[in-house]
Amino acid sequence: MHIPRNVTALALAAIFLLGGCASRGPVPTFYDFGPAAPMATVPESTPPVPVLVIADANGPSWLDSQRMYYRLLYADAQQSRPYAYNRWNTPPLQLLSQRLKTRVAQSGVKVLSTTDAAAGMPLLRIDVDDFSQNFDTQTQSSGHVSLRASLFRGHRLIDQKTFSRSGPAGSADAQGGAQALAAASDAIASDLLVWLGTLTIPKE
């Protein structure tokens, strides 16, 4: 029996389409920090400047991708592993930069980017050392954030401090890790505001 060419072509196309659908893996799930809630407590001392330039955070290259990483401290603490089907919707360096800027702005300080700043304005630089979910056991994990903050006026270093925060994850999965890392980032933002409030920034 003769089969028309157009019917054959359609059948082949359907086979390829079905084969492509069957070969696809699970659809990735994307996470972020969620909306920035109002600050639970207002720092007793506010930053000593009305305007602060905050540069985007720097960090290792693996934090400049959307992959979510975790460590099995009970098995091999030196190895970081990516989740197979879970992603950040924005690289962690960008997520952390935006959350810190939001928290500083909530304290009443006007926040500018480096492209909008005038010469001589106080500049805050952030260098991120770690941003990962750490498993102590197969069922217990925490989110850990560690960074170094440096405050400059012109080319002069005013002060520098390292901040580190950890918080328990509500579940031993990527969702729990995302929530714990968001909470740890908020805690560091609060610590950062307290530190800024203790500094004396000389005038130009």
Where are these regions (language model features)?
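Structured, soluble extracytoplasmic/luminal domains of envelope-associated proteins
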Residues: 83-108
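C-terminal motif of bacterial Sec signal peptides marking the signal peptidase cleavage site
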Residues: 17-20
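Short secondary-structure boundary motifs at beta->alpha junctions and helix caps
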Residues: 69, 76-87, 156-194
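Sec-exported extracytoplasmic/periplasmic mature domains
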Residues: 101, 105-109, 193-201
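Soluble periplasmic/extracytoplasmic beta-strand elements of cell-envelope proteins
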Residues: 51-56, 71, 123-128, 144-150, ...
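Surface-exposed short loop/turn segments
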Residues: 23-40, 106-154, 171
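Bacterial N-terminal signal peptides that target proteins for export
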Residues: 1-10
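A structural "domain/chain start" motif
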Residues: 22-92, 199-204
